[in-house]
Regions:
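OB/S1-fold single-stranded nucleic-acid-binding modules
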Residues: 6, 19-72, 166-168
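Short nucleic-acid-contacting surface segments enriched for D/E, G, S/T with interspersed K/R
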Residues: 113-130
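N-terminal post-signal-peptidase region of extra-cytosolic proteins
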Residues: 79-83, 106-118
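Positively charged n-region of N-terminal signal peptides that target proteins for export
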Residues: 1-4
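OB-fold/S1-family single-stranded nucleic acid-binding modules
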Residues: 135-167
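Bacterial N-terminal signal peptides
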Residues: 7-15
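OB-fold (S1/OB) nucleic-acid-binding surfaces
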Residues: 89-109
């Protein structure tokens, strides 16, 4: 009886192992294939060059400095350095801030229904507290891009991002 149970169990385990091994051998997922194709394109090559350049490394170093605060959604002290984004930017409304000695783009996106009125009252050298869930980068910008989720000034909340409807 034990031999029969052992033989049946073994006959079920071996085909499963072969199926899983075959899935791993098949290779890359479509996402990996698409990424490799993009990396081989002119845009992908330019992006890789930017990542390896001094400007790209500076942006990544700036992201690394605030990564813990982003992950924990904790307060970051900032000073407003400019009320306008760099020339030619397409991030919607935003300002330039200095956090711990590094400059960042603080982006809010496209305005709807006067939601940025309190932000427009900010002045250069105002001290604010930022909470954010996201920091990103792009070769077009020489600074990391922080998405402003909550902005406080003098302990008063002046902006809170409204989450999008439908999930994300």
């Amino acid at each position: 009886m034990k031999k029969i149970v052992f033989a049946l169990t073994l006959s079920l385990i071996i085909p499963r192992g072969l199926v899983f091994a075959n899935n791993e051998i098949k290779g890359e997922t479509p996402a990996k294939t698409a990424r490799k194709a993009w990396e081989a394109s002119p845009e992908g090559i330019a992006f890789k060059k930017w990542e390896a350049s001094a400007a790209g490394k500076k942006v990544y170093a700036g992201e690394a400095k605030i990564r813990k605060s982003i992950r924990e959604f904790s307060n970051m002290n900032a000073v407003v350095t400019s009320l306008m984004l760099p020339q030619g930017s397409r991030l919607g409304y935003g300002i330039m801030v200095n956090i711990n000695g590094d400059d960042y783009v603080l982006a809010f996106g496209v305005e709807s229904k006067h939601e940025f009125d309190q932000l427009r009252k900010l002045k250069v050298n105002d001290k604010i507290m930022i909470k954010s869930h996201n920091v990103s980068h792009a070769p077009k910008y020489a600074f990391p891009i922080v998405a402003g989720d909550n902005i406080e000034r003098n302990g008063k909340l002046i902006y809170k991002r409204v989450p999008g409807k439908g999930g994300c």
